Structure formats: C-alpha cells, structure tokens
C-alpha cells in the first residue's frame, strides 16, 4: 500500500485553487458512500514521486493533517479521477474515493499483457484494445492488475472479455464479446491470402473446361 500525506484545505474556490498551484500544491477532495467530502491539498513534489507507481486500483493510505501538522484522519482510498491542464498536462486536481466495507465499487484495473504471440512471429502485430479493464469488486478484493497471456495467439486470433481470468468476486463490466487484445493480420498478408484463395477457387473451373473441350 502506498502512503501519501495531505493537509486539510480550509479555504475553497477557484481563486484559492489557483493560489495553491502557484505554491506547488495540488487541490484534491476525498469522498465516498459514507464519507462527507473533505477538501485537502497535497505537495506536488511528494505527489510526483509516487504518481508513476500508482493506478486507479492501487490502495493508498492517505494521512490527513491540519496546518499545524497534527494527524486528523487516516483513510484507505483509491485514486478516482485526475484532472490535468489542457495545455501543460500537469495535474490540477485529484479525487480520492474512500470505499465502505460491504459496498461494491467500480474501478479500472490495468491490463498486463505477457508473452509474445506466434502470430507476431508470422508478421502480424498485437493490438491492445483495452489497457484498463473496468470491474466491479469488493474494496478488499481489488486486483492490482489483470494478466492475459497472448503467447498462443495466431494471426487473426482474439481474446474477448469473457476469456479473462478474474479473481473470485471480481466482475468484468465489459460485454462478453468485447475484444480485449488481438493479433491483426497485416494488409499485404491479407491480400496475399485472398489472392491465393481466388486462384484455388478458379483452378477446378479451368480443369473442367479443358475436360469438356477434349470430349
């Protein structure tokens, strides 16, 4: 579990949010089914150290302190939403979700692709349609990642949502027929195969005509 420190944000509003960002802090809010929204602020320098290591499925121990440095609350939360500046792409606001025991939650879990498909060895290329899988689960059963082995995939093969192996109690929210990963056939290979099929289909007709002429 990742640990992150936040400070209570006493003053709210857009003007205050801009002031915080200029000071190197990121405004955020904590909420949940049984949690009243708590406005907080986090040092950008602290956030940047862990941001590349967490996903929406990573449980975070959020230590909330007041301006004097006294701990007022410790909560297990998940990163629910990240707002970024449209131009600079820097993080401007965060939403943290505190689940309640017995209350199922919807969350996106990273997809981990392992292995090299046999179809890639034949000139195909692997297409990943979903880098994250939306699931419904109990808070204490959130998987850190969903692994899918693509080693046996040949040209044109597809792994659908129904093929994913999920832990007990975790439900995939994609349609069963939804494609997750596939080995796509390169255009030139597809044209070659189509030409060969046409030639094979035409061959018996040519032979038949020859036989008729000989008669």
Curated annotation (Swiss-Prot):
One of its GO terms (cellular component) is cytosolic large ribosomal subunit. It comes from Thermotoga maritima (strain ATCC 43589 / DSM 3109 / JCM 10099 / NBRC 100826 / MSB8). The keyword Ribonucleoprotein applies. Pfam families: Ribosomal_L25p, Ribosomal_TL5_C. One of its GO terms (molecular function) is structural constituent of ribosome. Residues 192-215 are annotated as: Disordered. Residues 192-203 have a biased composition (Acidic residues). It comes from the Bacteria. Keywords: Ribonucleoprotein, Ribosomal protein, RNA-binding, rRNA-binding. This is Large ribosomal subunit protein bL25. The keyword Kinase does not apply. SUPFAM superfamilies: Ribosomal protein L25-like. CDD domains: Ribosomal_L25_TL5_CTC. Belongs to the bacterial ribosomal protein bL25 family. CTC subfamily. Residues 205-215 have a biased composition (Basic and acidic residues). Part of the 50S ribosomal subunit; part of the 5S rRNA/L5/L18/L25 subcomplex. Contacts the 5S rRNA. Binds to the 5S rRNA independently of L5 and L18. GO terms for biological process: translation. This is one of the proteins that binds to the 5S RNA in the ribosome where it forms part of the central protuberance. PANTHER family: RIBOSOMAL PROTEIN L25/GLN-TRNA SYNTHETASE, ANTI-CODON-BINDING DOMAIN-CONTAINING PROTEIN, RIBOSOMAL PROTEIN L25_GLN-TRNA SYNTHETASE, ANTI-CODON-BINDING DOMAIN-CONTAINING PROTEIN.
